[in-house]
Amino acid sequence: MAMAKNVVVIGAQWGDEGKGKIVDWLAEEAGGVVRFQGGHNAGHTLVVGGKKTILRLIPSGILHESLDCFIGSGVVVSPEALLGEIDELNAAGVKNVEGRLKIAPTCPLILPYHIALDQAREASRGKGKIGTTGRGIGPAYEDKVARRAIRAADLLHPEKLREKLDAILAYYNVQLQHLHNAEPVKAEDVMAVIEKVALRIAPMITDVSRVLNEKNKNGEKLLFEGAQGALLDIDYGTYPFVTSSNCLAGAASAGAGVGPQMLDYVLGIVKAYTTRVGSGPFPTELFDEVGAGLAERGHEFGSVTGRARRCGWFDAAALKRSIQINGISGMCITKLDVMDGVETINICVGYELPDGGKTDILPCGSDAVETCKPIYETMPGWRESTFGVKSYDALPANAKAYLKRIEEVCGAPVAIVSTGPDREETIVLHHPFA
């Protein structure tokens, strides 16, 4: 039997590109959807039949009621956030969530001391804030690398955890009390959380790597769902204004426990303009009424944090870096409709550097990006509405010209165009599973 085709969906900018909708749409054809990195620091918003659902940890395929969903080892899991999300889905009438959700035993857990340290550190930074969501993601990844993490498998034996926990809290409380003048975390409080969640989470703990490899051998298509965006990647993003995990397509292999040869197609999700949340350099950021208009029409507020997103022109030079480090096979352009009515559109095709030189690709690291001045190409916009358009031919001529120019400058084909939040409001030029 020929192996099935598998697709990785990643955010190709600074996150918030609209991955959730596209994963939900692609899930129709999948035998499993897998989260492979990140935590509950970013929300994936789905709109089905006008009904809105925000997921943070659970893969966006969960609304398809016969579909198995997986949380791989690369994800840091807040047990309380996970159960809260399951309860929300149950209340919304989604069937058999706990029966269909499988969690790798090797997932590090986010516990109260991670959140306490994350928030205390950010408060101490003053003007040097990184823009963390304060949900404990960074400290949980630190524990993983320092080999002191409490992992999902530990929930199967909570009675053995106390000794391990005492050693961890000694480390955390020294920092909380002496570096940040914050309250210490009590072992009893952490154990209370662990005991509360262990019984419900234990049945979901599964050898995710093995199940995914078996599904692949059986010819089932798999969908790997990235969180955040490539330009927030811990290695290749605008460091230190980045997230704590690898957000690239290659991370799907390690974070889900599958070989890289199982990743057949990389779909990069790309907004028709650029946004960024929190601190960090943003060469094409707009501070005028055009930027304010994009924010308003695009509802640019974080689905989890409620934070306003910064808006700017499309940055093809930044996207080039993303295409390079992810091996993007095709792009899905989202929120094209938000550009309706913008009279003149700028596309950033490169940057001027402080030494007078030029580059056509985003440099690595925050200091280098901070000094970049965008070089723009100008195109005429369109007045007609693209909202809800379902065929490429029905798009305004200038909208098609805009998409074509993005392809030419970035060097990757447009496979899908999203013209609204509902899964039906989608134009398909090339299906990733085809």
Swiss-Prot record:
Any GO BP: 'de novo' AMP biosynthetic process
Main location class: cytoplasm
Residues the record marks as active site: D16 (proton acceptor), H44 (proton donor)
InterPro entries with a match to the protein in the record: Adenylosuccin_syn_GTP-bd, Adenylosuccin_syn_Lys_AS, Adenylosuccinate_synth_dom1, Adenylosuccinate_synth_dom2, Adenylosuccinate_synth_dom3, Adenylosuccinate_synthetase, P-loop_NTPase
The keyword Magnesium belongs to this UniProt entry's keyword annotation: yes
Binding site for GTP: 15-21, 43-45, 309, 335-337, 418-420
A GO term, aspect molecular function: magnesium ion binding
Catalytic activity: IMP + L-aspartate + GTP = N(6)-(1,2-dicarboxyethyl)-AMP + GDP + phosphate + 2 H(+)
Keyword Magnesium listed: yes
Compartment(s): Cytoplasm
Family, as annotated: Belongs to the adenylosuccinate synthetase family.
Protein name in UniProt: Adenylosuccinate synthetase
Taxonomic classification: Bacteria, Pseudomonadati, Pseudomonadota, Betaproteobacteria, Neisseriales
